[in-house]
């Protein structure tokens, strides 16, 4: 069986489930009722209505700032903001990402000139396929609490919640257990997961979405290849530089008690190993002309 990175874009599309970022975004934005139900399920809150969800909403505070995209960004009728992120790999910077995302949501929710008291309640939700914190919990729900007295809450209206899908069987409710079973690609038995399965199947019959997915995958492969080539060049240059520095250090240590003949002998050894005359000259202290003479002799 092929590893995920070995699959072609077409094979990835065939195997894609709701846990795939692209499929998740399309299903949620095309079905606001299911997005609303998912939020209520995850957060155990009641939502009267939501605006049409936005897939991969782009945020950029100013020209020089780092631009990012939210997977699914939605607001409800009271102005509360929700960002739902699918995280398929185990990354160590999720807490900082959540902090950054929450700040951007605050900027987005405040119209120009508005008072800070008008900041809306905001939720950053990560659906992680692996344990983001390694403590074996099914859910990590963070709130700002006073260090000296845990009874004192900051009540700044921000919420950061990380779900550990690998612990689907430990989720606090049956509905959550069924949803995260489905997210893991396992058989689930609930009306909600049945609806999700139908929508995922429908999404994968959409030729336009398939084309966008294939294009995105190909672009990502090109970017990864370019970055890999750039990194390989950097590493190669650093390895050459490290070797030269190591050779120079060895020569300088030995050269203190060396006669000129010994230096030339060492230079000949380097030349015999097909090391460039310029590098040999740099390491031995001989002039390039002297090294070339030795090479021709």
What are these language model-derived features?
Residues 2-14, 82-87, 174-297:
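Short, charged alpha-helical interaction segments and adjacent helix-coil junctions
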Residues 1-208, 225:
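Conserved single-residue anchors adjacent to enzymatic active/cofactor-binding motifs
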